[in-house]
C-alpha cells in the first residue's frame, strides 16, 4: 500500500484510477494483486489459508475466538469498498477464490481430529461464503453479509466458549474427547 501511495499520491480509487477498468500499468496491477493477497491472508481465504489451522490449534481459546471473527469481518468490510469500485477481472478472481475457499475449508474440516483445527477449516469456508456476498453486488448483498457476520460472531464466540469450558473441565482437545 505504501507503493500505491508513493506512486499515485493517495490511496483513493480516484487517485489511483484502478476503478475505471482501463489501466494497463502492469506495476499497478501487480501492486493491486499484492494488496488482494494481503486481504485474502487477513480473512483466511484460500489460497492464503495455510496458517489458520496451526494458529487456531496452538493459540489459547480466547485469542482464537477473537482471531476467528473480528479480522475477518474487518477485511470483508474493506473488500466491499474495493470490489464496488473495481473492474470485472477482480470480481471473477474473487468468485474463484470463494469457491476454492469453500471447498478447501469443508474438505479440510472433514478430515480433522482436533476440534480447533476443524473450526479453523470451518473459518476458511466462512470466508468463502462472505466473499460470495461481496461479488453478488445486489441490493441485499451488503445486508446479507452483515447478517452472516453477526451470526458468525455469535456462533464462533459460543463455540470457542464451549471448547474453553470443556477443555478446562475434561482436558478435551480432540473430537473424540468431547463425546
Predicted region positions:
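Alpha-helical transmembrane segments of multi-pass membrane proteins predominantly involved
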Residues: 1-179
